[in-house]
Curated annotation (Swiss-Prot):
Organism: Pongo abelii (Sumatran orangutan)
Residues annotated as binding Mg(2+) 2: D245, E293, D318
Residue span of region Required for interaction with PLG: 405-434
Molecular function in Gene Ontology: magnesium ion binding; phosphopyruvate hydratase activity
Protein name per UniProt: Alpha-enolase
Pathways involved: Carbohydrate degradation; glycolysis; pyruvate from D-glyceraldehyde 3-phosphate: step 4/5
N6-succinyllysine: residues bearing it: K60, K89, K228, K420
Post-translational modification remark: ISGylated.
Gene Ontology, cellular component aspect: phosphopyruvate hydratase complex; plasma membrane
Cofactor (UniProt): Mg(2+)
The protein's Enzyme Commission number: 4.2.1.11
Binding site for substrate: H158, E167, E293, D318, S370, H371, R372, S373, K394
Gene name in the database record: ENO1
Length: 434
């Protein structure tokens, strides 16, 4: 069924910034998608087009991206009479019309909004759930429920505290199914809230952009200690492991790293990549840390390679790879990491997201699907993670509706699959392994 009409508008994300929403109409109805936005943006990612009109929304308006959809992309797609199940053809057409390497003409936020809406319409056209349509597009016969990685302590660019490292996550790998993983996550979260309140006072339980707590601690080890205590108090020491997103590019300073980057600058406290690697290894030794994302700067290739070879855990590339097939191929060649963080808006289309995922999986990597810090009520990534069988998703703490929207959709998918539902559990790094 071809597209009858496409209409885009400015809506608001969870930080009160404008973002793009797309309504796509076929004879089967209306299909709506909204685009997320990140706080820490990699320099190699597809361009999110903002108006830069300082008199409006501090320059963050997206009326140009909206206009590109309404005036250029929409008429082209409607006139071509393409079937909404032809995801790759439609995405390719938009990318060719844009004609730039990083989607800077229309904006990745324009192309992605349409791409997501097309995917949702394609599922209904085929009469299958969205996760099944995505599995078909990716060539997967199975679907798998992921382990959720709940970001429960926030630091870095996401929080107003002194903590350098951006995310401290809990992964309930010992759960029997996704519903139990949610329960464990929620119970640990509430225990953590009490632990933080007792130790730092009630105002320390205010939440950050992704629903995690942002207590004013400086030592990253203290963050891990709080998690360990909360997991123990909840009674899940044998079922929960820890993940971190360091976002080290945010505190990379002339070849070194500043773990107190939110204080006045003082080069004498910078540490070398090797010292930082040793710090991570002490975390791995003393705590159940099984996954570290962006441990080094996006161009500190040597440090990545050395760490991945010796750490023995999941090393996730986000700023390093920005979901870009060229960067992924380089990281595969250099053995820089062993897991891809998949963010649809970093590459800017459904087709390219699927290609990036397949490329990573074909090279033996894990893949973790991710939200952005500026989110909407859109739940596309919940279906995406199930259809791509990646086995792991991070979409914030079990708090704030834009985060829960994704987790609740995963609960519904598990319920719909019934006895056929498979949960990644402890195999979250390679859930398709027999």
């Amino acid at each position: 069924m071809s597209i009858l009409k496409i209409h885009a508008r400015e809506i608001f994300d969870s930080r009160g910034n404008p973002t793009v929403e797309v309504d796509l109409f076929t004879s089967k109805g209306l299909f709506r998608a909204a685009v997320p936005s990140g706080a820490s943006t990699g320099i190699y990612e597809a361009l999110e087009l903002r108006d830069n009109d300082k008199t409006r929304y501090m320059g963050k308006g997206v009326s140009k991206a909206v206009e590109h959809i309404n005036k250029t992309i929409a008429p082209a797609l409607v006139s071509k009479k393409l079937n909404v199940t032809e995801q790759e053809k439609i995405d390719k057409l938009m990318i060719e019309m844009d004609g730039t390497e990083n989607k800077s003409k229309f904006g990745a936020n324009a192309i992605l909004g349409v791409s997501l809406a097309v995917c949702k319409a394609g599922a209904v056209e085929k009469g299958v759930p969205l996760y099944r349509h995505i599995a078909d597009l990716a060539g997967n016969s199975e679907v798998i429920l992921p382990v959720p990685a709940f970001n429960v302590i926030n630091g870095g660019s996401h929080a107003g505290n002194k903590l350098a490292m951006q995310e401290f996550m809990i992964l309930p790998v010992g759960a029997a199914n996704f519903r139990e993983a949610m329960r464990i996550g929620a119970e640990v979260y509430h225990n953590l809230k009490n632990v933080i309140k007792e130790k730092y006072g009630k105002d320390a339980t205010n939440v950050g952009d992704e629903g995690g707590f942002a207590p004013n601690i400086l030592e990253n080890k203290e963050g891990l200690e709080l998690l360990k205590t909360a997991i123990g108090k909840a009674g899940y020491t044998d079922k929960v492991v820890i993940g971190m997103d360091v976002a080290a590019s945010e505190f990379f300073r002339s070849g070194k790293y500043d773990l107190d980057f939110k204080s006045p600058d003082d080069p004498s406290r910078y540490i070398s990549p090797d010292q930082l690697a040793d710090l991570y290894k002490s975390f791995i030794k003393d705590y159940p840390v099984v996954s570290i994302e962006d441990p080094f700067d996006q161009d500190d290739w040597g440090a990545w390679q050395k760490f991945t070879a010796s750490a023995g855990i999941q090393v996730v590339g986000d700023d390093l790879t920005v979901t870009n097939p060229k960067r992924i191929a380089k990281a595969v060649n250099e053995k820089s990491c062993n897991c891809l963080l998949l963010k649809v808006n970093r590459i800017g289309s459904v087709t390219e997201s699927l290609q990036a995922c397949k490329l990573a999986q074909a090279n033996g990597w894990g893949v973790m699907v991710s939200h952005r810090s500026g989110e909407t009520e859109d739940t596309f990534i919940a279906d995406l993670v199930v259809g791509l069988c990646t086995g792991q998703i991070k979409t914030g703490a079990p708090c704030r509706s834009e985060r829960l929207a994704k987790y609740n959709q995963l609960l519904r998918i598990e319920e719909e699959l019934g006895s056929k539902a498979k949960f990644a559990g402890r195999n979250f790094r390679n859930p398709l392994a027999k």
